[in-house]
Amino acid sequence: MAHAVKIYDTCIGCTQCVRACPTDVLEMIPWDGCKANQIASAPRTEDCVGCKRCESRCPTDFLSVRVYLGNETTRSMGLSY
């Protein structure tokens, strides 16, 4: 089962989500659009286990996790979009 990680533009570059992820799905990349000049990115979504630790640590609710089976969304993980 794959999980998709959606990054929103409210990231403040605090790195809380990156440090919370047990499977290193997230990383910080340079970004001119936020105060910290970096934003979370999810280059390894195939490693996401859907634990949502990143979501719970985020102070701005900037990301969400959805569960996918194949190419089709089968259920959301109780998040508002």
Swiss-Prot record:
Binding, [4Fe-4S] cluster 1: C11, C14, C17, C58
UniProt keyword list: 4Fe-4S, Chloroplast, Electron transport, Iron, Iron-sulfur, Membrane, Metal-binding, Oxidoreductase, Photosynthesis, Photosystem I, Plastid, Repeat, Thylakoid, Transport
Membrane protein topology class: Peripheral membrane protein
Catalytic activity: reduced [plastocyanin] + hnu + oxidized [2Fe-2S]-[ferredoxin] = oxidized [plastocyanin] + reduced [2Fe-2S]-[ferredoxin]
GO molecular function annotations of the record: 4 iron, 4 sulfur cluster binding; electron transfer activity; metal ion binding; oxidoreductase activity
InterPro entries: 4Fe4S_Fe-S-bd, 4Fe4S_Fe_S_CS, PSI_iron-sulfur_center, PSI_PsaC
Entry-linked Pfam families: Fer4_21 (PF14697)
Cellular localisation: Plastid, Chloroplast thylakoid membrane
EC number: 1.97.1.12
GO CC annotation, single: photosystem I
Positions with a binding annotation for [4Fe-4S] cluster 2: C21, C48, C51, C54
Cofactor(s) listed in the protein's UniProt record: [4Fe-4S] cluster
Cofactor note: Binds 2 [4Fe-4S] clusters. Cluster 2 is most probably the spectroscopically characterized electron acceptor FA and cluster 1 is most probably FB.
Primary site of residence: plastid
Gene Ontology biological-process annotations: photosynthetic electron transport in photosystem I
Domain (4Fe-4S ferredoxin-type) ranges: 2-31, 39-68
Subunit field text: The eukaryotic PSI reaction center is composed of at least 11 subunits.
Function per UniProt: Apoprotein for the two 4Fe-4S centers FA and FB of photosystem I (PSI); essential for photochemical activity. FB is the terminal electron acceptor of PSI, donating electrons to ferredoxin. The C-terminus interacts with PsaA/B/D and helps assemble the protein into the PSI complex. Required for binding of PsaD and PsaE to PSI. PSI is a plastocyanin-ferredoxin oxidoreductase, converting photonic excitation into a charge separation, which transfers an electron from the donor P700 chlorophyll pair to the spectroscopically characterized acceptors A0, A1, FX, FA and FB in turn.
Record NCBIfam families: PS_I_psaC
Name listed for the protein in its UniProt record: Photosystem I iron-sulfur center
Organism: Marchantia polymorpha (Common liverwort)
Lineage of the organism: Eukaryota, Viridiplantae, Streptophyta, Embryophyta, Marchantiophyta
